[in-house]
Amino acid sequence: IDTTGSIKTKDNQMSFGLENFWEDDNLYSFSSVMLRPNGIDVYLYRGASKMLEHRKLSIPWNINSIGSDLNSFNINTNGYYSESKFNNQGDKIYFLDSTNDTIDQYSLSTPWDISTTTYDSKSFSVSSQEASPSSFSFNSDGSKLYVIGGMSSKIMYQYSLGTAWDISTASYDSKSFSFVSLDTYVPDFTFNATGTKIYVAGYSNKSIYQYSL
């Protein structure tokens, strides 16, 4: 993202303007923002207060139309959760514990209803590969996990899950890719729906970079 509010890609330098934005009085207290595939339900996690919040967009995919809290859920953890991700079905949620370098797994007895969240007593440590993980992502069927060290190594690591979406069955594939020349800090990344593209955020350069697989 450059100073004109445009996103540029690494492959072909295409860009587009960011027309919508949203500000909150406590914006910087959010460590993670998740959007349900319906484009209506928004889930916000505040790392400092350990509070997961659910809100709705009155206009799908338009963040300016976000409403007030519908419900919230306090996550009881001794670490600091810096990022969170749902699985595709909305019945699992995963948190990246940047204090202990683990990914912790929770279940929702009613999909997408955070008031039904319980800890599965399942976690996976990435400390053998990365001491400062900044982001993670799953592939579409939950059989692969990807973790990136945003500020220290700037390396993405690949893991396999023996049982899909069960974080306790993860194991390192001995596969990695370095983004060390990209930026001084790469805080986040995401894949496209088919897994053929990776989009990596560069903090210092205020850019989003596109890679092909």
Range-by-range predicted roles:
Residues 1-213:
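Polar, enzyme-active/binding microenvironments
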